[in-house]
A protein has these predicted regions:
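Short, solvent-exposed loop/turn segments at secondary-structure junctions
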Residues: 22-25, 30-32, 124-127, 151-154, ...
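A short alpha->loop->secondary-structure connector
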Residues: 135-146
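Cys/His-rich short segments
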Residues: 147-195
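Short active-site loop/helix that positions an aromatic residue
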Residues: 126-136
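Gly/serine-rich nucleotide phosphate-binding loop at the start of the catalytic core
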Residues: 1-117, 122-128, 340-348
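A Trp-anchored, charged/polar loop motif used as the substrate-binding/catalytic surface
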Residues: 1-4, 99-105, 188-206
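SIR2/sirtuin-family catalytic core signature
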Residues: 1-19, 25-27, 203-348
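Conserved beta-strand scaffold positions in the cores of enzyme catalytic domains, especially
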Residues: 119, 145-147, 280
Length: 348
């Protein structure tokens, strides 16, 4: 294979973005359309006002982490009522979240990728789904979406396996979609028990094994989620060829200590010769520097030795201050151009 063939083969690989609860919080810093907040696992019950439900259990919980609390309830037969009530309230709460009318980082994230790429979310809220539907007004060349713990706004066909917006019907057999179940945070998860969840993970593992760039946005890979971490590692090393040029970028809060990074991400970085970067903002990543051309831009710079800069970016100074029309106009040159043409990648 010639150098040019190697270059093009690398550039054609997907970009995978793994999304956790921190991404939703970052995307709606002032709350959703109605001012409602999301939450991470730690402090989840208190922040979202569910402490009254737990009082009915009569248990004194030593932890404020939802996974610890829910696992305790799941292990006790005398807490079935409380557990089911908590599940219902969580589902209803996340179903009530609505994306703001203004553009969010989720909109930019979705628009920064194309159909060869993938966003895999652990989140229950439907804000990514809302953003995806909004970006369809600009283009239908958008990334594949995967829901690793289910989602309140996603349904699936029990016959054909297709999935989509929860109120839609299967495009093949026209059966109304069944609501995807939420995978609640017990200590020992089984990702194979639910057909929909299993299929989502199968597709996710394929993307992870092939991705040239993996961006981790607001997901900490908690040590307690042993099954997920094992799946991540096994999928990442499935392809045996050298992943020397592959890249991991982690979006973390400003001032994040590199020493606090999840051991799961450090382990993965050993297979790509330490190519792991911590970024303080979405706007510092390849997604924002080379929207819709992230792998192509990364390849041209780091493999082809290009010293240029991107002609179209999502700039930190501009942030999310676009109207939908302005965003469509800003990105329009990248909707029809070749990945390597002068509109998207200019030389100095």
């Amino acid at each position: 294979m010639s150098n040019d063939d190697t270059y093009k083969a690398f550039a054609s690989r997907p970009h995978l973005v793994i999304v956790g609860a921190g991404a939703t919080i970052d995307s709606i810093p002032n709350g959703d359309k109605n001012g409602q907040q999301s939450a991470v696992m730690k402090g989840f019950i208190d922040k979202l006002g569910f402490t009254g439900i737990l009082a009915d259990s009569g248990i004194q919980f030593d932890s404020d982490n939802l996974e610890d609390i829910y696992s305790t309830l799941a292990e006790r037969n005398d807490c079935t009522y409380v557990r089911e009530k908590l599940e219902t309230e969580i589902f209803n709460y996340f179903s009530s979240l609505e994306i703001p009318d203004t553009i969010t980082k989720y909109d930019l994230l979705i628009l920064s990728l194309t159909r060869k790429d993938c966003i895999a979310t652990f989140n229950w809220d439907g804000l990514l789904v809302d953003a995806y539907r909004r970006m369809l007004k600009i283009t239908d060349n958008l990334p594949q979406m995967l829901f690793l713990h289910g989602n309140v706004k996603v349904g699936y066909c029990t016959k054909c396996g297709n999935y989509g917006y929860h109120t839609y019907c299967c495009p093949r057999c026209h059966t109304p979609f069944a609501q995807s179940k939420l995978l609640f945070p017990i200590r020992h998860k089984n990702y194979n028990n639910n057909t929909f969840i299993k299929t989502q993970w199968d597709i996710f593992e394929d993307f992870l094994s092939n991705a040239a760039i993996v961006t981790i946005y607001g997901y900490s890979a908690p040590k307690t989620d042993v099954e997920a971490i094992e799946k991540l590692k096994s999928a990442f090393i499935r392809i045996t060829q050298d992943r020397y040029f592959d890249q991991i970028q982690i979006i973390e809060r400003p001032g994040f200590n590199r020493n606090d990074i999840s051991s799961a991400w450090e382990d993965l970085s050993t297979y790509i010769h330490g190519h792991l970067e911590i970024k303080e903002s979405f706007f510092d990543t390849y997604l924002a520097e080379f929207p819709r051309r992230s792998v192509e831009g990364y390849t041209k710079r780091n493999i082809a030795g290009w010293w240029g800069s991107s002609n179209k970016t999502f700039e930190k100074e501009k942030g999310t201050n676009y109207t939908l029309k302005e965003l469509a106009m800003h990105i329009s040159p990248l909707l029809t151009s070749d990945p390597f043409d002068s509109l998207s990648l200019k030389t100095l």
